[in-house]
Amino acid sequence: METYKGIQFFSNKGTVKNAFKKSNLGYEVMLDRKEDENFIYSNYEHVETQVEKDSKGMVVCKKYKNTYEILVEKVKEKRLGVLLVGIGGNNATTMLGGICANAKDLSYMNKCDLKRSNYLGSVFLSSNIRLGYNEKDKEHAYAPIYKLIDIYNPENIVYGGWDINNMNLKDCLVRNKVFDNEVIEKIKDDLDYVPLKSVYFKGNFIAGNQQRRVNNILYGKNKLEILEQVREQIRNFKKQNNLNELIVLWSGNTEKNIPHIPGVNDTFLNILHACKKNHESVSPSVIYALAAILENSPFINSSPQNTLVSAVVQLAQQKGIFIIGNDLKTGQTKIKNFLLDFYFGTGLKPKSIVSYNHLGNNDGKNLSSDLQFYSKKVSKSNLICDYVRANENLYVDDEKDTNVLVKKSIDYCEGDSLNEKGKVSADIEDDCTYVESLEKQKVNSEIVIKYVPYVGDDKKAIDEYISEIFMNGKNTIVLYNICQDSMLASPILIDLILLVELSQRVFFKPNQEKKTNEDEHLLNENIQIEDYKLSHTILKPKYSSFKNLDSVLFLSSLFCKSPFNSTVYKTRHSFFSQLESLWNFVRIISGLPIDAHIDLPYMI
């Protein structure tokens, strides 16, 4: 029988406050805002440019304004839980081990020095945001985000989760080989936890080399029955741990990508029928996403696959539940992200970006399979495509054949030396088509990932960037990056959890309302799937005149390789735009004006 008691790092610390605080900072920030014991109140006027093309091809720019009343709930006594899919994996155990070490304020010796636990790499817990300018001292003033607004303490969250393998988490710490032995010895008893039974379907969703890990799975007649079992697990965990809110986070293996299939995964009704019929396209991650949303729990996809199909998005939007994806932006892609900002921002023209990396953890093992690697490759490549579309003027001349010495031969022999009249085979046609597609790329982009067991979690990455510079010169930058993959990923998982929790406490009242779709509230609390009635609850708005953020939480784009777009907005891929968007969001909800980076009063 499964146990639903979660992991609680705060149980040995006595009474603790849910809002994150750091005791070694000897100051507080006093903000010019209205607040009481329950809420922070602020107002914000948003000004943006709306762009349209008229019938003559003219780009018309119009200024648009809207004012918002903002209501932010304080954390207070809320109990939050997080269920991780793939809880025994490197990322999940590293995140939990790090939070545990911080909760215990752990110090330990590595081979170089005495070290203390920290949250380095977390935007919410370690980075500083600009407050304004101190004219007297002629200094810009900065403070951590948690000094401006309540950020939930990750050490106070109740954790649990699923895994296809039943190994206890304290043994997973040893198997995954991320932490030093001294750290493992000091935290392993706090991670004494056996994962819940998980969902596993054959059909190449994950690599075949993972089959030998499978010994801890749910069984059912069809995928709808298994979906209902996962929902029951979520309810039981929430009830036994006395939780007010719960977040489900996919930290499992990369799955293969699933195509958009009309009639199957285009609407929530169709995908529920597809579950009943055991349709081959319904993956384990889709089961968890549907289960989380039906249980009114936000869902985070930290892996590359396209779990957030149209059906999942529609269900989330009709229920008003946050969804986040896809794939964590950790080392190589994060560097690529801000390097592309540098290239395009300074008028340079990237032409070739080749990325190679090898690693030896279970992520690398799973990605050694072609189907799973393809999901990763697509996720890593989306970044470049959006930058090129935003800077098409740099590539106009590339569409012309500027090299007059090279001409493509139209008249060629389809046979060979033995058969002059032969026909070109399908394999040759495919090969030619593939090569021609590479030759047509505005930026040649290639990604290679190899599994090398010996290196373990220490991923080695090599990147070569070639760009065109002034008067057709060339510039080449080569980077060699060695990083502990899971230690880069773990603070990003923490940030995604904290962002979702914060977003659930923020409400907006716009002066001008958007038009809503007529079918926005067609969802019933009882859904008939053939002979089965699926029941769920629909949350009512907390405050009648205030609204939550859209279900597709694109503020998370800073943390995701392939950030998901909503039905009305396409996310910007610029690293600094994403970072400033998140920081400005924090500013306006805490009562500060946005930082426009112009400092005009000091220019005049």
UniProtKB/Swiss-Prot annotation:
InterPro entries: Myo-inos-1-P_Synthase, Myo-inos-1-P_Synthase_GAPDH, NAD(P)-bd_dom_sf
Domain of life: Eukaryota
MF terms (GO), sorted A to Z: inositol-3-phosphate synthase activity
Pathway where this protein functions: Polyol metabolism; myo-inositol biosynthesis; myo-inositol from D-glucose 6-phosphate: step 1/2
Pfam families: Inos-1-P_synth, NAD_binding_5
Listed GO CC annotations: cytoplasm
Enzyme nomenclature, EC number: 5.5.1.4
Record has Transmembrane as a keyword: no
Residues that bind NAD(+): 88-91, 163, 198-199, 210, 213, 251-254, 303, 327-328, 330, 361-363, 376, 456-457, 485-486
Cofactor(s) this protein requires: NAD(+)
Catalytic activity: D-glucose 6-phosphate = 1D-myo-inositol 3-phosphate
Keyword annotations of the record: Inositol biosynthesis, Isomerase, Lipid biosynthesis, Lipid metabolism, NAD, Phospholipid biosynthesis, Phospholipid metabolism
Cysteine disulfide partners in this protein: none
Family: Belongs to the myo-inositol 1-phosphate synthase family.
Known role: Key enzyme in myo-inositol biosynthesis pathway that catalyzes the conversion of glucose 6-phosphate to 1-myo-inositol 1-phosphate in a NAD-dependent manner. Rate-limiting enzyme in the synthesis of all inositol-containing compounds. De novo-synthesized myo-inositol is essential for incorporation into GPI (glycosylphosphatidylinositol) glycolipids during intra-erythrocytic development.
This protein's name: Inositol-3-phosphate synthase 1
Source species of the chain: Plasmodium falciparum (isolate 3D7)
Source lineage: Eukaryota, Sar, Alveolata, Apicomplexa, Aconoidasida
This protein's encoding gene: INO1
